[in-house]
A protein has these predicted regions:
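Conserved beta-strand elements of the Class I
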Residues: 2, 83, 129, 183-186
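A Trp-anchored, charged/polar loop motif used as the substrate-binding/catalytic surface
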Residues: 62-73
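Alpha-helical structural motif
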Residues: 12, 40, 113, 175-178
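Catalytic core of membrane glycerolipid acyltransferases/transacylases, capturing the structured
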Residues: 1-60
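Well-ordered alpha-helical segments embedded in enzymatic catalytic cores
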Residues: 15, 67, 113-116
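Hydrophobic, Leu/Ile/Phe/Ala-enriched alpha-helical segments that form helix-helix packing faces
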Residues: 20, 71-75, 118-121, 182-189
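A cross-family acyltransferase "interaction/gating" segment
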Residues: 33-48, 76-169
Length: 193
């Protein structure tokens, strides 16, 4: 599966792993390179072959694209669900205001990782899981989760097909895939609104 979700907290990762555990192939995230240095978790993500991205633009963007493609080639060999937090970062009111996002509870989407995954693996995906996570009692911190103070969590999952016209020919970029992902994300904005 190709999985996309909104992103508010580190807790989102725990929630997604819990919701999808043993229901779909293991989730693998496109992860910020800095997170490799987080004790235990960074090593685990490295050992599990999560792709680490620098996300700085320029030459780094080309290196990220190549790293992402290599990761997707490995994903083709082992059942994997490719996960993308489409906003590219955790939502905060300050980031929302700075971006002037057209969505009430979401940042503007960054769909490069989805386009890359569709370019490399499009024909292998069973479907697109459009996930919305809502914390009605307020967004918890990772410490809240560890202390058992998670509160209510609402997870909405919509299984969407990936239209054939969105998939690029092998080796070609996936601009239509990015547009499709943006459309799905816009619908999620309505759910959160």
């Amino acid at each position: 599966y190709l999985v996309a979700s909104n992103h508010q907290s580190w807790v989102d990762i725990l929630v997604l792993q819990r919701v999808f555990n043993r229901r779909i192939p293991m989730l693998k995230f496109f992860t910020k390179k800095e997170l490799i240095y987080v004790p235990v978790i960074g090593f685990a993500w490295w050992a599990l072959d999560f792709p680490f991205m620098q996300r700085k633009g320029g030459a780094s963007a080309r290196a990220d694209l190549e790293a992402g493609r290599k990761a997707c080639e490995k994903f083709r060999l082992v059942p994997t669900s490719v996960m993308s937090f489409v906003e590219g970062t955790r939502f905060t009111p300050a980031k929302h205001a700075q971006q002037k996002s057209p969505y009430r509870h979401l940042l503007k989407p960054k769909v490069g990782s989805i386009g890359m995954a569709l370019e490399a693996l499009g024909d292998a995906f069973t479907g697109f899981l459009d996930v919305t996570i809502v914390y009605p009692d307020g967004t918890p911190t990772f410490t809240d989760a560890l202390a058992g103070r998670l509160g209510n969590v609402v997870v909405r999952v919509h299984l969407r097909s990936i239209p054939a016209e969105v998939l690029p020919p092998p080796g070609e970029p996936a601009p239509r895939a990015a547009v499709q992902a943006h459309h799905a994300f816009s619908q999620s904005g309505g759910v959160l609104g």
